[in-house]
């Protein structure tokens, strides 16, 4: 059989393929009964089988011959992974090394056997005379692995340190720093590694001594624990074809390491294992070389090298034969693999060639020529044309604006502010604002106006005109509410605004709101209306007069567009179309506007326009549209008429494309595109609308088309096909009568003159004055828009339905002779004037230099000063006592128990926009200040502070680029880093680099269960893993002994179930991640803490320190000068806590990845508060951990306030922290709670627009990560210490909801915060009068004074009784005078404390929470908590829902109170009422307030300095972290048991 195979292969290679003869030879001449094919599949045997069936089957049956044909699957064993590893390794320099074998010297004679083998494999063989070979280094003497080294390695890996950093003189107990969980984990590993050899209390024995103790009886090899670590390292970090056996073989051949030295080597490799799997041979080689370098350095040895030897003696030849034989076998095996590959390739090529042969030639030619029309089209039309016709219309991206009823409240608030001023500057704004309010007025806004008037009367406005103005607007609103909104043309050049004073405005509003505008001329000048005929433009006096009347009416009475549907194309920034849109919305029109620049910036511009000008009933629909695309034209018309209520009344096709600098000789694809936009597709658009009206039978409502004509009929030149496009539109007027669409469209041509400030005319604005000097009139864009809007709202529109009309707003431009030349002269004059001015300036400069000298000039320029960036904390501005506090003091002084008043003294946050300061900048303005940019750039690691010598050797103190180490001037930071900062902050597309485990929603990992259909190659594993595999898979796994001790070969068989990773795409791709590059290490937090704790704890640590600094605290132990250690509490909460640790505990542990042994503790929600206390405070106070989903922070505030009011604490940290991880994001998405970001993108929304909780289009919330912390203290303590006070927490409450089945459903339980008996709002009753008297602050003050008189009487009586008792004691000889004096002092102290307690209780009962008195609560919590400070519900100036930033213009001190509400999944309704700090200052005297200011000033300066130094030095948090408790260890019990213990001598 072997001979047959060799002959067959020789025959096949020696001659052209003669397979038919070969078959006949095997089946006929040789009569072979068994035919075996060696190859990848049954290729040849199948062919032979068919031949046998056709020619030999009947003969064989007659002769009784039974033939069988065997393919590879019938005779081959399944591929074995270990064998494949050996096969690949044998072809390399050393077994697993990916290097070619050494060259063979041409003088070495190979053996006969070797030559024969080469011939049989088809490998060309030379006849060398001599071989030079690398001799592996000699095997080094084996030494056992020291036990102390194993112990150090185990401890180092648990501590996330290098073993070199572990001193053998230290004990394990000292190294772990008291972390009991970590201690137990290490001890468990020791017992597993050295079973039966671990002494008692090993944690208290130095590592060196521990190693000596456990080395007795140790075999010098790796134990169970370290062997498992080595195996995991190899299986997870080495390439798939590298098992432990191949690694050990490599170490032996490369460096001569014996087994125990290999153990030491591998243990070192475990410690220094790479972060990710090594994928290339070079990376494996480099990794092992690096480990070898360090290993031999530790052993004090040089790295052994293979020696090259030329072998000529017989002895060496014998040694060479073994090496060469191994290589030859590798060559043979490699050749066999190549043969198999070539057979497969050949078969594949045959199939491909056959397929190609069956393909018709004309098909190939057609595919070859398919690109020719495309190339021709691009050549003809050009790239600019191709790019300009790309469709962009998408109905899903529509933006709808219709909430005029909401924006009016902003207008009314602005009206209240403006009407207070008594100057002419506010008059124009006041009139325009009044118009907008009248156009938007509704019942809800009337209530708002009425309330504003009432408040103005109550507050006693200093400006009496203020109330009259508001009253006038209110009375006018009552009239206009029943009328349609109107557009008033206030932009004409023929009208002026006359200020008649507020009195004049008030009286005019009573008569007519628009009498402030007085026309100078009744008729507009030079605006003729007519029609185009064969003889040209013919003026119609009748129509001209009609238009003049309409213009006059638009300026005096106004025009309305209620019920009109309008389509506008070409309403970009500063355009005429945008001005028309503004007027249409003012008049109540429903408008569709298209834009070819559909960005968040554009949509925001239109939203702001609607907010300002949208009137009652008006609607604005914004849609992306490219008028250069026929697809978009069709899509737009079909989209509009899907809703027949939007049948169009007006079409304003003003989209245009500028064509500057294109003459007849250089018309290009841009000119063709412009012609398509301004003519071809404009006509198609009109045709589509006409077609839709016709198909729906709409013949009584023709749409009026305002065609944009131009007086420029080529008179300016160099404008491409612009003039041709405009002139061609005039032909449409003739087609109105000659074609059949006159019932559906009416035409009005508008000759648009020189309009300043538009995009098309921007370059010509500088010569507009010269044009007017030539006798033509130029227009502003608002003025032109006003005239066009008047055309639409006047009587001319009706006339257009009879015949097309043309309105000449050209301003006489076409009458100027030689306009082109005169404009050129004007430009030339401007250039000459500019050059003359430059020459004069240069002459003056030279004269200055000649007088003062060049040196002084350089000095002047070199001393330019730039402001330096100062990173500092922001503090609340303290109010003036006489102006802001004294008016309140009369009623509030000493009215409340300040020990139970809760105030906020500090706060901080870490979130998508950085901290609270940078977030405020971005949410207020959308831009960053230089300080804000520098702070974020530092936070993201883009810059760092440097003090020292710069690259050029000069001393430097300032900012440095973290990457290039280049010095960065302060004034360059904003321009250099702002774009990068904005790109990687805020709500944005998820960045996998900063996600836990590199989560990428584009490739979300999951596992797919698969049942094996065939056996897999074997892989190497430890005996323990092999046993686990057998336990799981049973008879579907085969285990055999491996090539090294303790290793097994495991083969999964067909039928075994495995899980295979897959990556899918998840549609939640946007989140609010913290700024990219944020690192806790930048704040000085040590690697040990970073490795130990969960990220949420790191967030909280940083925020806590910044909150302390915001509170003016530079050392946490300063608290204990004023309070006991049990009076500092922590109520920081979270909805899920350490999500990153939770994921590791479940997923990574399941996948057998390295996980800390104490990971469980980091998943507890209260662990964050515990770490803060252990690292910063050392408090013995309460830790309470609220869990309230989205309402967690308000629940925390509620819990903290309760602790202080109940006197269980005097200082409480409150807030919440959340992380963003893959699993929670997926589950929120599954329950449709978060917005589908892909759907949002389809609707044209950018990431920063996806979180919009107050919008009607809200489609779910957007997840984010970060932390927010507040410091709460009692008001008494804050005033005593001089802490900044940001607000008073007047009331907090949590509310559940009714029966239901939906956990996330928002409830109405917070309404209970307004609970009170119904009759308190009704007619007066005895009960009602009593309840209302409690709300009166003056009445309660009288009651409190009466109670204080009683307490004073109690003190007097108690002192009298004490004197009597002392007298009796003095008569008793059993007591010494010292005893009596001590007794007297104790009793006096008791009387004083009791009086203070009673007075505090009285103030609390009649001040803080008077509204809780009685079994039947008569006053609602909201009403009562405000009344305690002399306020009512109308004093709540700001209401924030779910914590969104609100920008409040003007004087922030005008805000008296605010309400914050939030709702969390699981019926967590919450509300908090906050009050301005000046009300607290009104409860103390002026002297006390001045003392507070002095303390506050010193404290804030110190905190600002600490903050700046922390950023500069990179130790902002680390300087706060404590190593010891605030008291000596031996005094711990005394401090815990004695409530009077305080920290003394604190500096």
Curated annotation (Swiss-Prot):
Taxonomic placement: Eukaryota, Fungi, Dikarya, Ascomycota, Pezizomycotina
Protein name: Fatty acid synthase subunit alpha
Family statement: Belongs to the thiolase-like superfamily. Fungal fatty acid synthetase subunit alpha family.
Additional detail: The genes involved in HC-toxin biosynthesis, called collectively TOX2, are organized into a diffuse cluster that spans >500 kb. All of the known genes are duplicated or triplicated within this region, with some variation in copy number and chromosomal location among different race 1 strains.
GO molecular function annotation: 3-oxoacyl-[acyl-carrier-protein] reductase (NADPH) activity; 3-oxoacyl-[acyl-carrier-protein] synthase activity; fatty acid synthase activity; holo-[acyl-carrier-protein] synthase activity
Biological process, per Gene Ontology: long-chain fatty acid biosynthetic process
UniProt modified residues of type O-(pantetheine 4'-phosphoryl)serine: 180
Domain Carrier: 145-221
């Amino acid at each position: 059989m072997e001979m047959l195979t060799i002959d067959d292969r020789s025959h096949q290679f020696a001659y052209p393929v003669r397979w038919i003869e070969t078959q006949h030879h095997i089946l006929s001449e040789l009569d072979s009964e068994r035919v075996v094919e060696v190859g990848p599949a049954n290729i040849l045997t199948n062919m032979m089988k068919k031949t046998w069936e056709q020619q030999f089957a009947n003969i064989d049956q007659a002769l009784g011959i039974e033939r069988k044909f065997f393919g590879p699957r019938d005779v081959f064993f399944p591929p074995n992974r270990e064998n494949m590893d050996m096969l690949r390794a044998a072809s390399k320099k050393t077994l697993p090394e990916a290097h070619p074998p050494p060259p063979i010297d041409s003088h070495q004679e190979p053996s006969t056997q070797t030559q024969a083998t080469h011939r049989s494999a088809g490998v060309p063989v030379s006849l060398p005379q001599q071989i030079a070979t690398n001799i592996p280094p000699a095997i080094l003497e084996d030494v056992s692995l020291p036990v102390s080294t194993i112990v150090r390695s185990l401890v180092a890996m648990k501590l996330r340190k290098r073993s070199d950093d572990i001193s053998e003189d230290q004990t394990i107990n000292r190294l772990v720093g008291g972390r009991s969980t970590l201690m137990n984990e290490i001890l468990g590993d020791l017992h597993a590694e050295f079973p039966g050899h671990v002494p008692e209390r090993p944690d208290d024995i130095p590592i060196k001594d521990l190693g000596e103790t456990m080395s007795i009886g140790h075999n010098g090899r790796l134990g169970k624990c370290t062997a498992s670590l080595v195996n995991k390292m190899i299986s997870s970090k080495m390439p798939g074809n590298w098992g432990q056996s191949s690694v050990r073989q490599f170490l032996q051949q490369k460096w001569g390491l014996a087994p125990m030295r290999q153990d030491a080597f591998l243990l070192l490799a475990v410690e220094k294992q790479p972060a990710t799997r090594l994928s290339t041979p070079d990376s494996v080689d480099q990794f092992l070389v690096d480990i070898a370098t360090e290993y031999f350095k530790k052993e004090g040895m040089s790295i052994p090298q293979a020696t090259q030897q030329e072998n000529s003696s017989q002895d060496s030849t014998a040694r060479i034969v073994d090496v060469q034989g191994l290589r030859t076998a590798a060559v043979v095996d490699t050749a066999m693999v190549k043969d198999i590959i070539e057979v497969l390739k050949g078969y594949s090529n045959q199939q491909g060639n056959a397929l190609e042969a069956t393909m018709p030639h004309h098909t190939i030619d057609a595919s070859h020529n398919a690109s020719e029309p495309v190339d021709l089209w691009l050549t003809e039309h050009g790239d600019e044309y191709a790019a300009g016709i790309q469709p962009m219309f998408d109905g899903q991206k529509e933006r709808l604006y219709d909430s005029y009823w909401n924006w009016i409240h902003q207008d009314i608030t602005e009206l209240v502010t403006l009407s207070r001023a008594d100057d002419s500057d506010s008059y124009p704004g006041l009139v325009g604002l009044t118009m907008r309010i009248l156009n938007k007025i509704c019942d809800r806004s009337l209530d708002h106006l009425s309330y504003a008037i009432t408040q103005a009367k109550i507050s006693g406005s200093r400006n009496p005109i203020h109330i009259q103005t508001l009253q006038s607007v209110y009375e006018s609103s009552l009239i206009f509410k029943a009328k349609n909104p109107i557009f008033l043309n206030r932009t004409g050049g023929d009208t002026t605004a006359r200020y008649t004073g507020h009195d004049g405005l008030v009286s005019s509003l009573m008569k007519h709101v628009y009498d402030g505008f007085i026309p100078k001329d009744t008729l507009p000048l030079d605006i003729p209306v007519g029609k185009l005929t064969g003889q040209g433009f013919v003026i119609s006096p009748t129509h001209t007069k009609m238009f003049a009347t309409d213009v006059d009416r638009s300026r005096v009475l106004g025009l309305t567009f209620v019920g009109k549907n309008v389509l506008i194309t070409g309403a970009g920034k500063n355009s005429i179309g945008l001005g028309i849109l503004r007027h249409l919305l003012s008049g109540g029109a429903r408008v569709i506007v298209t834009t070819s620049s559909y960005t968040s910036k554009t949509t925001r511009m239109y939203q702001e326009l609607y907010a300002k000008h949208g009137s009652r009933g008006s609607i604005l629909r914004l849609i992306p549209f490219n008028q250069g695309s026929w697809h978009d034209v069709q899509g737009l018309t079909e989209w509009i008429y899907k809703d027949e209520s939007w049948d169009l009344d007006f079409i304003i096709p003003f989209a245009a494309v500028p064509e500057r600098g294109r003459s007849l000789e250089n018309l290009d694809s841009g000119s063709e595109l412009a012609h398509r936009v301004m003519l071809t597709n404009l006509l198609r658009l009109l045709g589509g609308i006409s077609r839709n009206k016709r198909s729906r039978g709409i013949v009584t409502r023709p749409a009026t088309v305002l065609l944009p004509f131009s007086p420029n009929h080529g008179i300016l030149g160099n404008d491409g096909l612009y003039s041709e496009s405009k002139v061609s539109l005039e032909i449409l007027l003739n087609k109105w009568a000659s074609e059949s669409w006159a019932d559906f469209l009416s035409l009005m041509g508008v000759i648009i003159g020189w309009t300043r400030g538009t995009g098309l005319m921007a370059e010509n604005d500088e010569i507009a004055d010269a044009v007017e000097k030539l006798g033509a009139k130029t227009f502003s864009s608002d003025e032109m828009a006003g005239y066009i809007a008047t055309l639409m709202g006047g009587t001319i529109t009706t006339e257009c339905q009879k015949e097309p009309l043309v309105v000449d707003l050209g301003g006489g431009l076409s009458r100027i002779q030689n306009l082109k030349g005169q404009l050129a002269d004007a430009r030339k004059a401007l250039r000459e004037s500019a050059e003359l001015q430059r020459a004069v300036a240069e002459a003056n400069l030279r004269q200055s230099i000649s007088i003062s000298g060049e040196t002084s000039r350089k000095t002047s320029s070199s001393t330019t000063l730039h402001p330096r960036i100062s990173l500092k904390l922001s503090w609340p501005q303290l109010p003036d006592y006489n102006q802001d506090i004294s008016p309140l003091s009369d009623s509030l002084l000493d009215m409340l128990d300040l020990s139970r008043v809760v105030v906020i003294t500090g706060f901080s946050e870490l979130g998508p926009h950085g901290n609270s300061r940078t977030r405020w900048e971005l949410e207020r303005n959308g831009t960053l200040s230089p300080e804000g940019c520098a702070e974020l750039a530092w936070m993201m690691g883009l810059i760092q502070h440097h003090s020292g010598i710069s690259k050029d050797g000069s001393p430097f103190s300032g900012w440095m680029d973290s990457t290039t180490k280049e010095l960065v001037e302060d004034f360059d930071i904003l321009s250099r880093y702002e774009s990068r900062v904005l790109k990687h902050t805020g709500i944005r597309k998820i960045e996998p680099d900063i996600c836990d485990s590199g989560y990428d929603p584009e490739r979300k990992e999951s596992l797919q269960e698969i049942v094996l259909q065939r056996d897999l190659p074997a892989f190497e594993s430890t005996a323990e893993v092999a046993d686990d595999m057998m336990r799981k898979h049973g008879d579907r796994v085969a285990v055999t002994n491996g090539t090294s001790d303790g290793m097994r070969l495991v083969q999964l068989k067909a039928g075994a179930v495995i899980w295979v990773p897959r990556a899918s795409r998840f549609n939640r791709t946007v989140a609010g991640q913290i700024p990219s590059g944020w690192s806790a290490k930048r704040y000085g937090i040590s690697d040990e803490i970073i490795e130990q704790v969960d990220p949420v704890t790191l967030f909280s640590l940083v925020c806590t320190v910044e909150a302390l600094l915001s509170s003016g605290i530079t050392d946490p132990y300063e608290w204990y000068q004023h309070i006991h250690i049990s009076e500092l509490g922590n109520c920081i909460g979270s909805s899920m806590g350490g999500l990153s640790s939770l994921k590791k505990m479940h997923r990574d542990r399941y996948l057998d990845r390295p996980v800390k042994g104490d990971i469980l503790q980091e998943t507890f929600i209260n662990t964050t508060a515990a770490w803060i206390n252990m690292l910063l405070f050392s408090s013995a106070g309460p830790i309470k951990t609220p869990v309230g989903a989205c309402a967690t922070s308000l629940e925390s505030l509620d819990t903290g306030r309760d602790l202080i009011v109940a006197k269980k604490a005097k200082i409480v940290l409150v807030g919440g922290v959340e992380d963003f991880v893959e699993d929670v994001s997926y589950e929120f998405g599954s329950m449709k709670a978060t917005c589908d970001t892909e759907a949002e993108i389809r609707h044209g929304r950018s990431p920063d627009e996806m979180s919009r909780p107050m919008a009607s289009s809200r489609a779910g919330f957007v997840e984010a990560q970060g932390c927010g912390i507040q410091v709460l203290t009692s008001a008494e303590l804050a005033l005593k210490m001089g802490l900044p006070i940001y607000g008073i927490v007047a009331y907090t409450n949590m509310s559940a909801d009714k029966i239901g089945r939906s956990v996330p459903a928002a409830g109405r339980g917070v309404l209970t915060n307004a609970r009170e008996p119904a009759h308190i709002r009704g007619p007066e009753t005895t009960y009602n009068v009593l309840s209302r008297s409690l709300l009166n602050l003056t009445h309660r003050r009288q009651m409190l004074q009466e109670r204080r008189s009683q307490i004073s009487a109690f003190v007097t009586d108690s002192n009298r009784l004490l004197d009597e008792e002392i007298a009796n004691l003095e008569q008793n000889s059993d007591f010494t005078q010292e005893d009596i004096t001590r007794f007297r002092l104790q009793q006096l102290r008791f009387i004083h404390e009791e009086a203070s307690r009673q007075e505090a209780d009285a103030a609390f009962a009649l001040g803080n929470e008077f509204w809780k008195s009685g079994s039947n609560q008569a006053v609602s919590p909201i009403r009562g908590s405000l009344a305690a400070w002399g306020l009512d519900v109308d004093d709540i100036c700001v209401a924030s829902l779910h914590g969104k930033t609100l920008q409040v213009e003007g004087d922030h001190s005008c805000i008296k109170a605010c309400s914050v509400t939030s709702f969390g999944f699981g019926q967590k309704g919450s509300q908090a009422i906050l009050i301005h700090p000046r009300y607290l200052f009104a409860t103390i005297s002026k002297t006390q307030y001045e003392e507070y200011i002095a303390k506050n000033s010193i404290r804030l300066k110190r905190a600002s300095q600490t903050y700046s130094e922390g950023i500069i030095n990179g130790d902002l948090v680390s300087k706060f972290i404590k190593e010891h408790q605030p008291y000596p260890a031996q005094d711990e019990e005394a401090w815990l048991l004695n409530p009077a213990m305080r920290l003394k001598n604190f500096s």
